[in-house]
Amino acid sequence: MLCGCLLVFLLGIGGCVGCVACASYLDPNYNGSFDSYYDDDYDGSYDPFDDYGNGDYSDSYSASFTLSEIKDIFGSDLANAVEDGSCSPGIYTVGEDIDPGLYFLEGDPVLEGNFYVFDEEGADSYGIDKSVVYIGHYLTELERGDVIAYLPGDDALRMYPIAKASFAPEAPYQSGLYRVGTDIPAGEYAITPQKDAADNTTNESAAYVMKDLEFDDDSITDTKYVIAGGTQTVTVKDGDYLELFAVVATPADQAEKAS
């Protein structure tokens, strides 16, 4: 894998790992506790950001971009349409194009989508804060001054404030990000591969338990990887977030009855 958040920014890494990788280079005090999560498929031969003078990835946590540069990176063919708070794929400035708050990001149930959040660092200067590859749906907290690039891979998908989300998932739970105690109940879950999603990604199938959506080096409290034919068990409590990346979570009692 090419060293630095800049490649993660463009290509991403599976699930919330992309955010962890960003944290490792955005924060010079990062302690490396998530290094074992990284996918090592990248050989470092491609430098998509050389035009921006960021060849020294060892110092990439300090890299910044203008809004124009961010738009150039992702292309100019995005719709960037907002209708009644619902956003098409595009690039949005929080506080200007959309309101701050918690957002629900639609995604394909079996294919990868991406989003990137940039922090405002100064006048027309932004540093990357989050880089996420996800399957299903996701949530992200946006603050005034942030810039988000929402790239779900399908022009029909939308991003909108959580209050507008009609979301009532039923077990077993497919790929996506869930609020424990709100979207799904606390308890023990059996984690198994979601074959149709796993077939469409080169990243590892896994369940991530997070205590918050800050993506700090201690945000992830548990990770369970699963391979074809395998099963893992994860326990979550109210207030946690459970990300399912190409896996299915079945309540333990339901899984036991089915076995």
Locate each region found by the language model.
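A glycine-anchored, Pro-Gly-centered beta-turn/N-cap motif
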Residues: S88-L102, G176, V180, P185-E188
